[in-house]
Amino acid sequence: LVVTDAFGEPIKVRTVAAMEIFAAKTNALISRAAARDLYDFCNMADMKLFSDAENMFRKCIIFYATISANKVNKNFDTSAIDSIAFSKIKSDLFPVLAVRDKFNLEGKKQQAKEYIASLMKPTEAEMDYMERFMAKEYKPELLFENTEIIERLRNHPMALWKCK
């Protein structure tokens, strides 16, 4: 929830949590390997945005991996990142940047792959969640311990649809 007075008086605006946005972006980077995803992901890593909440971040990445992909990449294989070519950086990324800093593509690829490899070591319960999800059995309680989160996710439309 963000409160802003940009329109002359304070109003509340519901927003998606940054962790959820970056969990979805991490999955996008792993699967579609777009230049913008690599740039955003590495900025997140450089800012150490979730360094104090890595377990929750991993769980969010796992959740988004299950609801967004046709086939769950439960090993979090990052080889698609290698396919990002500098021509895509020039055509897709540079036009949306205010300043065209030197962009070390190979260094950024390596940084992203190492961060993901370090973070994405699912626990036994998290692996069980993914296996069951692939078998069309949705059990958010295997992924999250917090009852409030579990209850909010229990009726997640995309998860329910994918498990039909």
Model regions: which residues?
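Structured mid-to-C-terminal alpha-helical surface segments
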Residues: L1-K164
